[in-house]
Curated annotation (Swiss-Prot):
Annotated function: Required for efficient mating. Plays a role in maintenance of cell wall integrity during mating. Important for mating cell projection shape and conjugation bridge diameter. Plays a role in cell fusion and nuclear migration.
Induction of its expression: By mating pheromones. By cells of the opposite mating type.
Name of the protein this chain belongs to: Factor-induced gene 2 protein
Low complexity bias (residue ranges): 150-165, 213-243, 274-285, 1244-1259
Disulfide-bonded cysteines: none
GO CC terms: cell periphery; extracellular region; fungal-type cell wall; mating projection; side of membrane
Native organism: Saccharomyces cerevisiae (strain ATCC 204508 / S288c) (Baker's yeast)
Length: 1609
């Protein structure tokens, strides 16, 4: 049993140790550095010791200005505005790349014993640092000529972290390869096809041969992104020098030679692999947007190799021979360009390395040293000459560009929306089923009088015609740049030869072709149209005649054999729905450059001196002229949809989307060349040493007459294998911008209305859109007295109907009345998944040995001087590896979501007295009996509201609406083929008082969610040891967040629509009242302009005594109006400076009506009524107001003014939330407001400025500090702004976070939630060898709750970002979090602060506490000794702080191995302490107040009839006068809202927070807060992780187990 117990105990101990170790490892944070991968492989025996150190600096700066003028016209419903926008954008981008590398390797030479070891081991050391800084500052200015002005977008800048990886590779000659991957924004490729034929100058018949050389040279020039202009596209700007483009010039040539005699002979083939970039490239272009006239740059060209056959002059006494020389020319050009004087000064510093090769001859002498390891082979020395030249040239860039564009304007005319309506067409098929369709139609009314009988027709024509049209654009761009060449330059060594070169004079022509979709319009045949004269009579009685074409149709109706013909017409003013799209536009351009380089080296002597080798070489040459012609085709294809407009409209919702779409693709060429070169030569040269010039030789020709006899025995083998592989995939660039998408969603709910008429209950089921947030119960009593005279057989019997109707309706309405979504999605990207891949494989292997014997013979003295020189040189493998991988990702996602706007009427007092007098004259058989109906409705209600921040007290001001309308309806009732016309004339008088101020707009619930995605791409550069190439991978990740600027405002919710004939009379019944409460927080005045109406058709069927009468009526559709109000109020403020703040708003309203049918049966008579319910309009609010608290308000207003002023800010002395109202004394137009003395500061105040700006800037540099600044401000929504600035020098770091104090003031908003989350990921490798930067997301959660009882509960918990920086192991920066919890509860009389706790780290200070239970904290302390941790103490703390001061020490033994045995070599003491703290906070119960809303509605309609007279001529030439009328029915609804307060008590759950903390030790700090919250209130967990390291013990588990077993025993 003891053994089993021992095993169980051992298992427990092992399990505990495993858990403890896991816990220790959990807190360990190891900082790993990313090593630069290094690959060194030497497998050749003749690899000499070599070291290469290169420093590469690259900097480029470019800027472009993009002006554009955009003009758009938007027409929807009754809103039409034109806003030509002129935008000018300028960007200045500068980048710098500095790379330095050091590499050294060593291996033995020809040691067979150690060759195996050399090929496997190599010592290398490297040091690489890379810094890339990019700064972009666009400046945008916009101007609009409309009534509103778009906000100016603030400058934004983006940061681009970069990481560079350097890889060094050295392989054997048979597997040497070089790869180069690059990605550029543009590519320019050229192909040179040339054919040359050369004949050697030898006179030997056997060696006399000629060969033709054909080759293809392909050059690819990839410059930086050039300037882009919207009006003119420049393929390649000729005004900029080549070096200022900061591009890579890749030149590859392939020469294939074929001899004429078809003999097997190796022809020299040269592959110029200059695509490996120049060793040193310093390019800087200073061309700011302001326009500088001076540009200085220096440019070092890559080594260029030229080959030529030089024929030696032959003589009878000298055996001629042919030799070939390959020269390598490298130059450094330092030029400065002064644009002001248009002159350029160029300084050349060039060096020529000439490598002659000798042909095979008799081997006379062999250097014994060169025989080692090879068989009779030696390598000829390389002679290098340096020369410099200076030249001045007039750089006269004359560029002329002419562009012509032709556009065909198009215009579309549509019907006035007031003349259209939605018509429900019921179609009955043969089976008897009814199908209803809804379509827009044009309504017209015609009245026909025949023999004194007036017949009125109401017809409509469906709007079904469409017109599609497209725009044709043709443009041509031509540019002719001119540049003068250099005046001339000479080699500063000998005047016997000249070297002249002329600049390139490119001639580029661009031609563009575009394809567009034509549009055509279909119209009616002229045979179906006629000219109709429309006579319009206004209210004054004047007649206006207009002539318009109309579409005439004839309808024939046969009833019992009687044929009736109807003639109707529709004016030809149908609307057109159109979709405009440009299908494609293809632009192909060909740029032809004709460079001419003439190298004149006459027959004279070219003497080159080299100071390094102290040798002078004289070469006799003949004339050689090189001329090349380059044709550079550039193709560009793009597909662009300039403007795509799609408009669709449904009965309940409408959507409008417009977006420009542009996509383009570019392509480049791919070149793959494989070549092998083997050639030899014979020449005379001085003996030189490349590495260490210890021997000086001089060879001078005394005179021209002297002939040189030389005998050279040289054997040389050179193998050049070059593989150039370039892959450049098509570059896709798509720019899709969905600027505005408006979709309206209507929520309808069913309601049941019970009507009791004379004791008979009738139930109606109707539907109306949701327009409130509560249950509405309306009870109304209406008494209607109707006097109707029914005539039958010339006898009329009057009938009096008295109807008492009691209506009770309960409508459950949803919380969202309408939804307006303004989404702005900008997707801009340039993707090149495969980037550009260039692989260059170059292998050079050369072995040579030569023995030369030279004899100088002079013709005058006949003396000969002989000298011998022999040189053996071996060139090892030179391999290059260039690999550059660039990935470019443009990802921009921006979305703006605006939820719906809830509006309700609060705290209003409505007193209305309405008297309606309807006089109806019923005529039958030429007898008219007048009927007078008088209805007096008086309603008075005083609702109450608990909110006081935006309390609206309405003054007793009445606005009387007086209208006089006359309705004339003519109905023809047909029965048994006998039709009796009936004319009904209705004269209506209405005088309606209207409250001046009836509504107060609440705060809008607008939440903004803006997501930004910043993707940082890395770059890798790999280049070899022996070549100082420029590894350039400039990856630009552009982050552009397009800000959609919209203006929105709330609609004036006044339920009054007036026609043009109405009169507005504003009277003030109480001008001398001193107790009339008045608040200027929000005021609306009646619109005084005439508004056209849109009508909806309805049909009513009435059956009286078996006679069915069909009435066709229509009700107006409330138009969508645009109100741009700008109010400027000057206020005299005490203790404040007088300020004048303008306020502007833009509102759009769309109200539609839907038809409903009600059937009523009274005394067996069935009556069908067709009614309509208005669809609640969509409205958005956006106001810009900056006000301050006022103690004295002076208001000057007129009844006809349209002003909107919304105050959303309060000062420190704001009104108390206890319900106090400010009372003002008004006298005339001056009001003095009395502010109560009691005031309290609200818990939170929301104050924001009306601007939307997003800006971020960053810069990374090794020498200066790194700054990352981001500012995000989104207004007028809930404040979500954060400013983060991180400074990261090489050794220290600092992070400061400033969050604006959340402030909120609301009076009607139940709940508003705003969450702002910003994530910044910055990566820059390598920053430093001992530093790592980590930024955590910054999240800020703000929730504002506003209850109806003036009880405000605000909680703002912002988690500060944690920063982990470990520049060294011993230094750790810790930033403690701060938590602030504030709860404010207000009662009807006072406000008191219950709990206010401020916590800093783990210490909390209690400011004021009335909680029922104080927080109890239980602290558990865990002690770790060695690898065992156990719980030692447990303490309970009351209050808000617990202190643990115990410190525990633990020792660890670290073992080190030396030799075969191991012994303890070091003992260290580590301190570790972990504290587990649990805090429980039980808050007190919160009592809030709920509001029950009751509303009562009263509806009275106003009918307006406008007479219209049509005059037309029939086929007989007789004039026919037809009188029609348009009827307007305007419902006036008065709603009284009553509120009732109900107390609601809620008890939050206790909040438990548990966190574990490691106390400070020598190894660092690791703290983790874990918050477990379960409550109904707001709890924000705070998670902070700090960089540190925990001690990891090098003890064996087995050792610990044995110790435990021994102890147990």
């Amino acid at each position: 049993m003891n053994s089993f117990a021992s095993l169980g105990l051992i298992y427990s101990v092992v399990n505990l140790l495993t858990r403890v170790e896991a816990q220790i490892v959990f807190y360990q944070n190891s900082s790993t550095s990313l090593p630069v991968p290094t690959l060194v492989s030497t497998s050749i025996a003749d690899f000499h010791e070599s070291s290469s150190t290169g420093e590469v600096q690259y900097s480029s700066s470019y800027s472009y200005v993009q002006p554009s003028i955009d003009s758009f016209t938007s027409s929807s419903f009754l809103t039409s505005f034109e806003a030509p926008t002129e935008t000018s954008s300028s960007y200045a981008v500068s980048s710098s790349l500095i790379t330095s590398d050091t590499f050294s390797s060593y291996s033995d030479i020809f040691d067979e014993e150690t060759s195996s070891l050399i090929s496997t081991s190599a010592a290398s050391s490297e040091k690489a640092s890379s810094t890339l800084s990019s700064t972009a500052q666009p400046h945008r200015t916009s101007h609009s000529s409309s009534s509103f002005e778009l906000p100016v977008t603030a400058p934004s800048s983006s940061s681009l972290p970069s990481s560079t990886s350097l890889t060094f590779t050295s392989v054997n000659p048979s597997q040497s390869w070089t790869s180069f991957n690059s990605e550029k924004s543009s590519a320019l490729s050229s192909t040179i096809d040339f054919t040359s034929s050369e004949i050697s100058g030898s006179t030997s018949p056997k060696s006399l041969e000629s060969f033709d050389t054909t080759g293809t040279i392909t050059s690819s020039y990839s410059p930086s992104p050039s300037s882009k202009n919207s009006n003119q596209t420049s393929l390649l700007s000729p005004l900029e020098p080549l070096s200022s483009s900061s591009g890579d010039l890749i030149l590859s040539s392939t020469i294939q030679a074929t001899t004429n005699d078809q003999t097997s002979k190796t022809i020299p083939t040269l592959v110029d692999a200059t695509s490996s970039l120049p060793p040193t490239l310093r390019s800087s272009s200073m061309a700011p947007t302001s326009g500088s006239d001076s540009i200085s740059h220096n440019f070092t060209s890559p080594p260029s190799k030229t080959s030529g056959n030089y024929d030696v002059l032959t003589s009878n006494s000298i055996d001629p021979s042919l030799f070939t020389t390959t020269s390598e020319y490298s130059s450094t050009q330092l030029s400065s360009l002064n644009r002001a004087s248009k002159s350029e000064t160029v300084n050349f510093t060039a060096s020529i390395a000439s490598t002659p090769f000798g042909t095979d001859s008799a081997t006379s002498l062999i250097d014994p040293i060169s025989s080692v390891g090879s068989t009779a082979s030696s390598f000829v020395g390389i002679s290098t000459a340096n020369f410099s030249t200076q030249g001045n040239s007039n750089y006269v860039p004359e560029s002329t560009a002419s562009g012509s564009s032709q556009y065909q304007d198009w215009s579309s005319s549509s019907l006035p929306l007031s003349q259209t309506t939605w018509v429900v067409i019921n179609t009955t098929n043969t089976q008897g089923s009814v199908t209803s369709t809804t379509s827009p139609a044009y309504v017209s009314t015609a009245t026909k009088t025949v023999d004194g009988v007036i017949t009125e027709y109401v017809t409509w024509c469906p709007l079904t015609q469409t017109k599609s049209q497209a725009i044709g654009v043709s443009s041509s761009i031509s540019s002719v740049p001119q540049a003068s060449s250099f005046s001339g330059s000479s080699i500063l060594s000998s005047n016997s030869s000249t070297l002249a070169a002329s600049n390139n004079v490119p001639e580029s022509t661009a031609s563009g072709s575009s394809q567009y979709q034509d549009w055509s319009s279909s119209s009616l045949p002229l045979s179906q149209t006629t000219w109709v004269v429309i006579n319009t009579t206004n209210t004054q009685g004047s007649v206006t005649s207009t002539t318009s074409p109309a579409y005439v149709s004839t309808a024939t109706k046969t009833v019992d054999g009687v044929i009736t013909e109807y003639v109707t017409w529709c004016p030809l003013t149908q609307t057109k729905s159109q979709a405009i799209g440009i299908s494609s536009s293809t632009i192909s351009a060909t740029q032809t450059s004709k460079p001419s380089s003439i190298l004149t080296l006459g027959i004279s002597t070219l003497q080159l001196s080299d100071a390094t080798f102290k040798g002078t070489e004289t070469i006799n040459t003949h004339l050689m002229t090189e001329s090349t012609s380059i044709t550079e085709p550039t193709y560009f294809s793009g597909t662009s949809d300039s403007f795509y407009l799609c408009t669709s409209e449904v009965n309940l919702a409408s959507s409008l989307s417009s977006y420009p779409n542009f996509s383009s693709s570019e392509g480049s060429t791919a070149t793959i060349t494989n070549s092998t070169v083997t050639f030899g030569s014979t020449s005379k040269y001085p003996s030189t040493s490349v590495s260490n010039p210890t021997e000086a030789s001089q060879h001078v020709s005394s005179s021209v007459n002297s002939l040189t006899d030389f005998t050279s025995n040289s054997t040389e083998t050179i193998a050049v294998i070059s593989n150039i592989h370039k892959t450049s995939s098509n570059k896709d660039y798509s720019l899709t911008t969905t600027q505005l998408k408006t979709s309206g969603m209507q929520t309808l709910v069913l309601s049941t209305v019970t009507t009791t008429v004379n004791g008979a209950a009738t139930e109606y089921t109707t539907w109306c859109p949701a327009s409130s947030i509560a249950y509405t119960t309306s009870i109304s009593y209406k008494t209607l007295v109707l006097t109707t005279e029914v005539c039958s057989h010339s006898e009329c019997t009057p009938t009096v109907i008295t109807s008492v109707t009691a209506t009770s309706s309960t409508i459950p309405l949803l919380s969202t009345s309408s939804s307006t979504v303004l989404s702005s999605t900008v997707s801009e990207g340039a993707k090149n998944p495969a980037a550009s891949e260039v692989t260059i494989n170059t292998q050079v292997s050369a072995t040579s040995e030569a023995t030369s014997t030279s004899t100088q013979v002079s013709a005058t003295s006949a003396t000969a001087t002989a000298s011998e020189s022999s040189t053996t040189s071996q060139v090892s493998t030179a391999s290059e590896t260039i690999s550059t991988l660039g990935t470019q990702n443009f990802t921009t996602t921006g979305s703006l979501l605006f939820p719906a706007l809830s509006t309700e009427m609060i705290n209003t007092t409505v007193v209305s007295r309405k008297t309606l007098i309807i006089s109806t004259e019923v005529c039958s058989h030429s007898k008219c009996v007048p009927t007078v109906i008088t209805e007096v409705v008086t309603s008075k209600g005083t609702p109450s509201n608990g909110h006081s921040s935006q309390t609206l007290q309405t003054e007793a001001v009445e606005v009387t609406l007086s209208s006089h309308q006359t309705v004339t309806m003519s109905t023809e009732v047909c029965s048994n083929s006998i039709c009796t016309p009936t004319v009904i004339t209705s004269v209506q008088m209405r005088s309606t008082p209207f409250p001046y101020l009836t509504s107060s707009t609440s705060s809008s619930s607008l939440a903004s969610t803006k997501k930004s995605s910043l993707e940082a791409s890395s770059e890798m550069s790999t280049f070899s040891v022996s070549t100082q190439s420029l590894p350039l991978a400039f990856t630009s990740s552009e982050k552009r967040s397009t800000t959609s600027v919209s203006q929105w405002s709330n609609t004036v919710l006044t339920n009054t629509i007036m026609s043009s004939s109405s009169n507005v009379i504003s009277t003030n019944e109480k001008p001398s009242s001193t107790t009339s409460p008045y608040n200027f927080s929000s005021g609306y005045s009646l619109p005084s302009s005439s508004t056209p109406s849109q009508y909806s058709l309805s049909t009513a069927t009435t059956t009286i005594n078996g006679i069915k009468t069909v009435y066709t009526t229509w009700c107006p559709l409330a138009e969508k109006s645009t109100v741009a109000a700008s109010s400027q109020s000057s206020r005299s403020v005490d203790r404040f400076v007088s300020s004048s703040k303008p306020s502007s708003s833009l509102s759009q309203t769309s109200i539609q009506y839907t038809l409903s049918t009600a059937t009523t049966t009274i005394s067996g008579l069935k009556t069908v009524y067709t009614t309509w319910c208005p669809l609640t309009s969509k409205s958005t609010l956006g106001a810009t107001t900056q006000t301050s608290s006022t103690a004295k308000v002076r208001i000057t207003s007129a009844s006809s003014a349209t002003s909107t002023s919304i105050s959303l800010s309060t000062s420190t002395e704001s009104e108390s939330s206890s319900g106090y109202l400010s009372k003002g004394v008004c006298s005339g137009t001056e009001c003095t407001q009395d502010v109560p003395t009691q005031s309290s500061s609200p818990a939170s105040t929301l104050a924001y400025s009306p601007s939307v700006s997003t800006s971020s800037s960053s810069s990374f540099s090794t020498t200066t500090a790194s700054t990352l600044t981001s500012t995000h401000t989104s207004v007028p929504l809930l404040p979500s702004s954060s400013s983060i600035s991180a400074s990261s020098p090489s050794s220290t770091s600092l992070l400061s976070t400033s969050l604006p104090s959340p402030a909120f003031t609301s009076s009607t908003l139940p709940t508003a939630t705003a969450v702002s989350s910003s994530t910044f990921i910055a990566s820059s490798l390598p920053l430093s060898s001992k530093s790592s930067l980590s930024l955590s997301p910054v999240s800020s959660s703000i929730l504002m709750s506003q209850f109806s009882s003036s009880s405000s509960s605000s909680s703002s918990l912002a988690s500060l970002p944690s920063l982990s920086i470990s520049p060294t192991v011993d230094t750790v920066s810790v930033l403690q979090p701060t938590t602030s919890i504030a709860t404010l509860t207000c009662t009807d009389s006072q406000c008191q602060q219950e709990v206010s706790t401020i916590c800093n780290g783990s210490n909390c200070d209690d400011v004021t506490s009335t909680a029922t239970t104080p927080p109890s904290t239980v602290t558990d302390t865990m002690t770790c000794t060695g690898s065992e941790c156990q719980k030692t103490t447990s303490s309970s703390c009351d209050g808000y702080s617990c202190k643990v001061s115990e410190t525990y020490k633990s020792s660890a033994t670290i073992s080190a191995c030396s030799g075969e045995g191991c012994q303890a070599s070091a003992t260290s003491e580590l301190n570790s302490q972990y504290v587990t703290m649990t805090s429980v906070i039980t808050p007190s119960a919160i009592t809030t107040t709920s509001v029950e809303v009751h509303s009562t509605e009263s509806t009275i309609s106003i009918t307006t009839v406008k007479p219209v007279t049509y005059t037309s001529s029939d086929t007989n030439g007789e004039l026919i006068t037809i009188t029609s009328s348009s009827q307007t029915v305007i419902p006036s609804v008065t709603t009284i809202i009553t509120r009732t307060k109900v107390a609601i008590t809620s008890a939050p759950k206790p909040t438990t927070t548990t966190y574990v903390e490691q106390r400070l030790s020598s190894s660092g700090i690791a703290t983790s807060f874990v918050a477990a919250a379960s409550s109904t209130w707001i709890t924000t967990p705070i998670v902070s992780t700090y960089a540190g390291s925990a001690s990891k013990f090098l003890c064996s588990k087995f050792f610990m187990i044995m110790v435990m077993v021994i102890n147990f025993i």
